[in-house]
């Protein structure tokens, strides 16, 4: 039976400033840590990416033509405050006013993120969110944007607090490239959640008319053998690192006893301690019921086995299937069931995980209000033929995830929209330009856009709300 989605559903496309804009030093933009980090460590840079800084009218026209009625955009903090605070860059402010005006002209609702992996370099090199001064700088930046851009009706504080801590201090594939420091992972999560809470409280206290929330990446964690208590424990601990710690901060305003016990175990085994203050919990408590929505980014699930060896993580950045490895001392080891498909980058394709994660939010955090799926999509080595890409695998991936999303709505979850990652092809942080996600193919040499087969499919979906 063909499943459907509600009439008022947002069929969106997602982007991010650093991955799409290019123009990394144009019109007074300040540096971000990624600029030098990519030059030093990778075979690509974010220049010109998809040149969204100049091409946004083209992309928004395509969005309108293909039924995309919402777009995720992030503001580059260092375009507004080149050093993260102090002097405002008027050309950066003007760019975003023009961009939001074009969104509204094209009837594409902008959902605007304040921070998408791109802390200004001056603050990043001073500890990023491990430095509590950064909390103040972020809240001040948020306050400026809320006041300056009243045309924005949907605000998100952060994109993926979890993968920031994970990428910067556990896997080490994001600047500053530190590995296996679990205390820094949790401290980064915590300080960013305090920043989120304070920005949300400020937005509500000022009486602004829009909505505000946060976007979390929530990969579902399963025990490899559900009958083995040690595997169950490994999945629970892995879930605390990536999901539960952050969700508790968002919706409980504190960390549950189970969460804290897990964190304490992980730190006892791996070393380090956390700085959690009374005023932090006052801020979290004050904001826990003020989130208007939760954005869920979901691409994959993981299966965990019991493991008692040393930590070792190998990141598969080049799409060489089977080259990744992930095991954490005192937590567990990822091992994927052989019957479940995975991408060339070892991302496990499991739509049921999205359903389970949505229902988990509904059950464990009943004050969630509503959910948007803010990222979901298939990274692929697209073949460009006949001025298009016949991306049936991408269509199939999105279709399967929309079907379980429809099931979740039927089962009582309040899900109001879906944003495919990504609207057009963009640069991928630790994979470069080979891994494409877009509805629209970008020739990175000429910056021409070409609709893929998936764009035509998505248009029909948006027009009919039928998942076919």
UniProtKB/Swiss-Prot annotation:
GO molecular function: 6-phospho-beta-galactosidase activity; beta-glucosidase activity
EC primary class: hydrolase
A GO cellular component annotation in the UniProt record: cytosol
Keywords: Glycosidase, Hydrolase
Family that this chain belongs to: Belongs to the glycosyl hydrolase 1 family.
Keyword Hydrolase included in the entry's annotation: yes
Protein name listed in UniProt: 6-phospho-beta-galactosidase
Pathway in which this enzyme or protein is active: Carbohydrate metabolism; lactose degradation; D-galactose 6-phosphate and beta-D-glucose from lactose 6-phosphate: step 1/1
Reaction catalyzed: a 6-phospho-beta-D-galactoside + H2O = D-galactose 6-phosphate + an alcohol
Residues holding D-galactose 6-phosphate: 19, 116, 159-160, 297, 428-429, 435, 437
Signal peptide (residue range): none
HAMAP family referenced in this protein's UniProt entry, alphabetically: LacG
Catalytic-site annotation from UniProt: 160, 375
Originating species: Streptococcus sanguinis (strain SK36)
Domain of life per record: Bacteria
InterPro entries: 6P-beta-galactosidase, Glyco_hydro_1, Glyco_hydro_1_AS, Glyco_hydro_1_N_CS, Glycoside_hydrolase_SF
Biological processes per GO annotation: lactose catabolic process via tagatose-6-phosphate
Entry's EC annotation: 3.2.1.85
């Amino acid at each position: 039976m063909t499943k459907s989605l509600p009439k008022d559903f947002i069929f969106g496309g997602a982007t991010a400033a650093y991955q799409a804009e290019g123009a990394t030093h144009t019109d007074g933009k300040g540096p971000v840590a990624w600029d030098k980090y990519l030059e030093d460590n990778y075979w690509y840079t974010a220049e010109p990416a998809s040149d969204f800084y100049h091409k946004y009218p083209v992309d928004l026209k395509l969005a309108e033509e293909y039924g995309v009625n919402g777009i995720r955009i992030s503001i580059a903090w260092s375009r507004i405050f080149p050093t993260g605070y102090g002097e405002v860059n008027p050309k950066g402010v003007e760019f975003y006013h023009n961009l939001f005006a074009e969104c509204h002209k094209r009837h594409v609702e902008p959902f605007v993120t304040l921070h998408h992996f791109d802390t200004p370099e001056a603050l990043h090199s001073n500890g990023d969110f491990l430095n509590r001064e950064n909390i103040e700088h972020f809240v001040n930046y948020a306050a400026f944007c809320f006041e300056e851009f009243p045309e924005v009706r949907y605000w998100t504080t952060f994109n993926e607090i979890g993968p920031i801590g994970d990428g910067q201090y556990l896997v080490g594939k994001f600047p500053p490239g530190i590995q296996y420091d679990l205390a820094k992972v949790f401290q980064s999560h915590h300080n960013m959640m305090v920043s989120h809470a304070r920005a949300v409280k400020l937005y509500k206290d000022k009486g602004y008319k829009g909505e505000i929330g946060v976007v979390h990446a929530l990969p579902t964690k399963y025990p490899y053998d559900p009958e083995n208590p040690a595997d169950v424990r490994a999945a629970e601990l892995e879930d605390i690192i990536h999901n539960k710690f952050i969700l508790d901060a968002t919706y409980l305003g504190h960390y549950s006893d189970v969460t804290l016990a897990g964190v304490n175990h992980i730190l006892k085994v791996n070393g380090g301690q956390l700085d959690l203050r009374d005023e932090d919990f006052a801020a979290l408590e004050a904001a826990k019921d003020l989130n208007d929505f939760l954005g869920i980014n979901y691409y994959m699930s993981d299966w965990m086995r019991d493991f008692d060896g040393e930590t070792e993580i190998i990141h598969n950045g080049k799409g060489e299937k089977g080259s990744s490895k992930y095991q954490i001392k005192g937590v567990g080891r990822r091992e994927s069931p052989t019957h479940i498909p995975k991408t060339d980058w070892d991302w496990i394709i499991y739509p049921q995980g999205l359903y389970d994660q949505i229902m988990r939010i509904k059950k464990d955090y009943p004050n969630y209000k509503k959910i948007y799926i803010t990222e979901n999509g298939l990274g692929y080595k697209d073949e460009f033929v006949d001025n298009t890409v016949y991306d049936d695998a991408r269509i199939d991936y999105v279709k399967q995830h929309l079907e379980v999303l429809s099931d979740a709505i039927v089962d009582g979850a309040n899900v109001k929209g879906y944003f495919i990652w990504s609207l057009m092809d963009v640069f991928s942080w630790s994979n470069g330009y080979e891994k494409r996600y877009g509805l629209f193919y970008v020739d990175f040499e000429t910056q021409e856009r070409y609709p893929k087969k998936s764009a035509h499919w998505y248009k029909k979906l948006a027009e009919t709300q039928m998942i076919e």
